Regions:
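Regulatory extensions flanking the kinase catalytic core
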Residues: 301, 453-454, 465-507
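Conserved short submotifs of the Hanks-type protein kinase catalytic core
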Residues: 224-238
Length: 507
């Protein structure tokens, strides 16, 4: 599916992952989210954004186990065909119900999209809207011209699924199921989005096209002022439906998939800026996930100014000693200086409330990939506490208060000084020392002393504390996280699950 975006050939943007597969299934809608975009872009942003959906499942390819008994292999092959036929029939029923469920307003929008792009109806058949946000709307569509283009982005191997090895073909013909439809997610980007924002997202997706667990860009089209991006249609579950029932090994697998994606992104010096459950599409059945929505992503250092957090300790002490706050500390006066000659600080504050790192709230002007690690830590805290959302602040001040309630005012003051900010509060609910993550988890899950944490749970909390370190310089990296003992649990459990499934499939 070749296309052209402002003269940029986007036909070769998809990865050639021959060691992975994915299946395309029904989408599950998730919740609305509110985006906090940077001050420089407030004219573009709206108050609420519903996460745009694309669905996914990755299945790692392992060594194929040969069947030495031809009759057993024939029986196994027939079982595969029967199961696939059942899935196909269920998919046709689901698709039929989807078509009936589209309301008139959505149908009008879909008809307009198809009419705005010449030849659109010959390539795609829109089925329904699966996401709507501040900057775009996402639709599920059938790829009518799938067989006419290079689909190396599609990890599914139909020939291996339907046809057994030549030496073991069944003697009697077996009816081949109807080839199931191929779906894509079509992201229509609003004309209110700046061209630079659109181009930035597509360029980043192009750079990440070979990365595991990252949603690839198939192609993109522009007609006059209308821009659409074509993405794979990935399967995932609703985070709210499964996160409370996850076991520690399952949590480890989930986080391992997420940090695999983060490592790929961070290796390219890219900040995602919007890590949250609805932007990491995870399928609990296959235990595979994919990172999506790079609308707020940017390259590290693209808009940086020096910040104290990256200076030496001696330089920070010198700057703090000569600050306005230090000069007034002997005789502090309430309020703000009447004639403040200091220039206002402007920094990127993009992200979703409840998932933004402390340095984003403190307006750090030199933000790095560590902001994504904090957000991943919030996801882990959400899962272990069984509370979603865990942080539910309405603005930056409330967000800092929520964090200070856990970490204590002393550590929050130190975190603020790292970025040249002063954190002061007189709220009685915020203590000096804060609370340990272990206590937070026990209180949130209503567990008493009769139900102490298991060794695996303590390992998970240790990993959580490494992710939610207030000092971004001391926060764990994605590469280090993948070597952590907690995420190694997920690798062992995933391998065990695979070999158990292989053994079951032989019989």
């Amino acid at each position: 599916m070749s296309g052209n975006f402002w003269g940029i050939d986007m036909a070769a943007t998809a990865p050639h992952h021959h060691d992975r597969q994915f299946e395309i299934h029904e989408d599950i809608r998730t919740e609305d989210t509110e985006m906090m975009v940077e001050e420089e872009r407030t004219e573009e942003a709206g108050p609420n954004e519903e996460d745009e959906h694309v669905q996914h499942s990755h299945v790692h390819q392992h060594h194929h186990i040969q069947h030495h008994n031809p009759q057993q292999q024939q029986h196994h092959h027939v079982q595969q065909q029967t199961h696939a036929a059942q899935e196909e029939e269920e998919e046709r029923v689901e698709e039929s119900s989807e078509d009936e469920a589209v309301d008139r307003g959505v149908q009008e929008d879909m008809d307009k999209l198809q009419s705005d792009f010449p030849g659109f109806r010959n390539r795609y058949r829109l089925i329904k809207r699966i996401g709507e946000g501040t900057f775009s709307t996402v639709y599920k569509a059938e790829d009518i011209m799938y067989d006419h283009y290079d689909n190396s982005w599609d990890y599914e191997d139909d020939s291996s699924k339907w046809t057994p090895p030549p030496s073991a073909k069944p003697s009697s013909p077996v009816q081949r199921p109807r080839r199931k439809a191929r779906y894509v997610a079509i992201k229509k980007i609003y004309v209110t989005s700046s061209p630079s924002r659109i181009l930035n997202e597509l360029e980043l997706l192009h750079d990440l096209r070979q990365c595991p667990s990252v949603c690839p860009l198939i192609t993109a089209f522009r007609h006059t002022d209308q821009v659409v991006a074509i993405l794979p249609y990935f399967r995932h579950g609703d985070f709210r439906a499964y996160f409370r029932d996850m076991t520690i090994p399952e949590i480890s697998i989930y986080l391992r998939e997420l940090f695999t994606a983060l490592k790929s992104v961070h290796d390219h010096k890219i900040l995602h800026r919007d890590i949250k459950p609805t932007n990491f599409l995870y399928d609990p059945t296959t235990q595979r996930g994919v990172l999506v929505d790079f609308g707020l992503a940017e390259r590290e250092g693209s808009d940086n100014k020096p910040c104290l957090c990256n200076e030496s300790r001696e330089v920070r002490k010198h700057r703090q000693a000569n600050s306005v706050w230090a000069q007034n500390s002997t005789n502090p006066q309430p309020g703000y200086p009447k004639s403040d000659t200091r220039s206002s600080r402007r920094a990127n504050r993009a992200g979703t409330r409840g998932f933004r790192a402390p340095e984003v709230l403190f307006k750090c002007t030199e933000q790095k990939t560590s902001i994504d690690i904090w957000s991943a830590g919030v996801i882990l805290l959400t899962i272990m506490s069984k509370r979603f959302p865990f942080f539910n602040s309405a603005d930056d001040v409330d967000a800092m208060i929520e964090i200070a309630t856990i970490f204590g005012s002393k550590r929050m003051k130190a975190a603020g000084l790292l970025h040249g900010c002063v954190f002061e509060t007189s709220l009685p609910t915020i203590g000096q020392g804060g609370f340990s993550m272990e206590k937070i988890i026990l209180w949130s899950t209503c567990r008493g002393e009769d139900k102490p944490l298991t060794p695996d749970e303590k390992m998970a909390i240790s990993f959580l504390e490494s992710c939610m370190e207030l000092d971004p310089g001391r926060r764990i990296t994605a590469e280090e996280a993948l070597r952590h003992d907690f995420l190694q649990l997920g690798e062992v459990e995933s391998d065990k699950r695979y070999y158990d499934q292989e053994s079951a499939d032989q019989y």
